[in-house]
Amino acid sequence: MYLVIIFLPLLGSIISGFFGRKIGVQGAQLITSSFIIITTMLAIFNFFEVGYNNIPLEINLFRWIDSESINILWGFYFDSLTVSMLIPVLIVSSLVHIYSIGYMSHDPHNQRFFSYLSLFTFMMIILVTANNYLLMFLGVEGVGVCSYLLVNFWFTRIAANQSSISAFLTNRVGDCFLTIGMFIIIWSFGNLDYSTVFSLAPYFNQEFITLIGICLLIGAMAKSSQIGLHVWLPQAMEGPTPVSALIHAATMVTAGVYLLMRSSPLIEYSSTVLILCLWLGAITTIFSSIIGLFQQDIKKVIAYSTMSQLGMMVIAIGLSSYNLALFHLVNHAFYKALLFLGAGAVIHSVSDNQDFRKYGGLKPFLPLAYSIMLIASLSLVAIPFMSGFYSKDFILESAYGQFYISSTLVYFIATIGAMFTTLYSVKVLYLTFLTNPNGPLNNYKNVDQGNIFINLPLIILAIFSIFFGYLTKDVFIGLGTSFFIDNRYFIHPSHEIMLDTEFALPTLFKLLPLFFTITLSIIGIMFSEFFGNLLIKFKFTNLGYNIFSLFNQRFLIEFFYNNYITNFVLKLGGQTTKVLYKGSVELLGPYGLEKRLLNLSKNIGSLSTGVITSYALYILIGLIFYVFLLYLNIDNNILLLLLFGIFSTINKK
């Protein structure tokens, strides 16, 4: 049953990709979707069997690498962390498959699309279930390649080509550091198996652990779109909307967070890595929230919202609250997938226009889309009793409950980020559904409310976004829970803060995020309704224009990368390639070797002058040299060097 969970999506991908012409569009949709649904049902069963009953399971298929002390198996490990990650990955993937049947119904390449979706899901399952870093790295590379294929699905569009290449190359930076971290692990621990590495970690030097942790953190930064390696995330919106929901809700962007959670027995011994995670997540949260407030593309706003929530998860990891990071990851997967698919329903209904300034007044035309986006937004801003409330607010409380200066500052920074999250959520809802119509008349005449394949996944995800957090909060973050008793997480005793967060936090700081959320929601709607002209007038002033340009252009980070880093690297690479090519081909390679042999033969040939005295001189020199060889013990290499020097000297003369 466990191997069926892993390999059934791969089988669906192969059938749809290689035999798509034989089975047709409906056959590809039916086979891939049914295989993913079966896999999801088995994963839910395993969630109860492995997670609730605390019965971890390891499956070793065959020996992959056997070289002296390095022994790496192709094996899979199912524990509470694995089955918890499989739940959002497979539920969202199955709903995206169903949604895509309706959303991509007019696309001529359905077989290829569903093959890519299933292959993406398979690679994510490999990443999550691997029992060693090398197999997990295979999954990381696999989801990177599949994301390139999916973002570039409409490969005739130049923007899709550029975005997919940007995403691929940005992730290669993180993968490079992840590879370096794996090399250090092999060199220091002698293996890449989780159990071996985590068992030996307490006995190693902290500098080694810090170096490995930083490499793993940079690898996670690329996959989970943390500041510095975040530029690919909004550009990946060029792919179809179901792809955006799959990549940015439950799969690729969570891979980096999962890597850090899985490596908790390693990074817990390095306070440097934990403090880096704490501040990296805080800066990412407020940075992405500010940028999201000034975007006009509905999918890009949701993408920056994803980046902000990933920053929250990294904050939780920096606080050593790994179960809290996992709980927020699972909750976030459901309501963020709901946001993306709801945005896709709106885009699908208004002639594929993504600028929400050209929407307005869609509430009477799309009541279901309005309802589900309202539910998802309420969960995103952590309104009480929605799923996001039980995890997001607890992360903020944990930051304040650690009672260190860094964590206290991070609490206020993340709270400000949550305030901006509220503002852009209200902005999207207001400009899309509530304000006066701003789009072409044809968009409203031809509004399509979607079919059962589009609406059913939205309803299911809305139910998860409302109830999942409440139903599972005691399982994931309850003080008496035994869900993680199999020790998949390791928290150093000096980093344990759950009790302080639960009992020592002032009520004011528990209610502060909720107060800001409600207040800013009211202020945002009132300001847009009654004082909108003031904002427009300020925007046309020099100060307002400069502020808006800075935030709308994403703090000019892409401009800096393109003009100062990318160009420099390209020039340096060009010069290096030129020098190495000249050195390897013209001096040492085939051309250089041929040239040197020809020169040597000419030097030897020039000794034949036709003059008797010259030949007599050669004979005399050779005789003297031979006599000396009888009495001197000279290495043969030195003799060859002397002969080469003599021939070179003669040639110069």
From Swiss-Prot:
Catalyzed chemical reaction(s): a ubiquinone + NADH + 5 H(+)(in) = a ubiquinol + NAD(+) + 4 H(+)(out)
Example GO BP: electron transport coupled proton transport
Subcellular location: Mitochondrion inner membrane
Regions crossing the membrane: 1-21, 30-50, 81-103, 120-140, 177-197, 200-220, 241-261, 274-294, 301-319, 331-351, 365-385, 403-423, 452-472, 511-531, 610-630, 631-651
Keywords in alphabetical order: Electron transport, Membrane, Mitochondrion, Mitochondrion inner membrane, NAD, Respiratory chain, Translocase, Transmembrane, Transmembrane helix, Transport, Ubiquinone
InterPro entries recorded: NADHpl_OxRdtase_5_subgr (IPR018393), ND/Mrp_TM (IPR001750), NU5C-like (IPR003945), Proton_antipo_N (IPR001516)
Domain of life the protein comes from: Eukaryota
One cellular component (GO) term of this entry: mitochondrial inner membrane
GO MF terms, alphabetically ordered: NADH dehydrogenase (ubiquinone) activity
Enzyme class, UniProt record, top EC level: translocase
EC number(s) recorded for this UniProt protein: 7.1.1.2
Keyword check for NAD: yes
Membrane-topology annotation of the record: Multi-pass membrane protein
UniProt keyword Transmembrane helix present: yes
Function field: Core subunit of the mitochondrial membrane respiratory chain NADH dehydrogenase (Complex I) that is believed to belong to the minimal assembly required for catalysis. Complex I functions in the transfer of electrons from NADH to the respiratory chain. The immediate electron acceptor for the enzyme is believed to be ubiquinone.
Family label: Belongs to the complex I subunit 5 family.
Record-given protein name: NADH-ubiquinone oxidoreductase chain 5
Gene: ND5
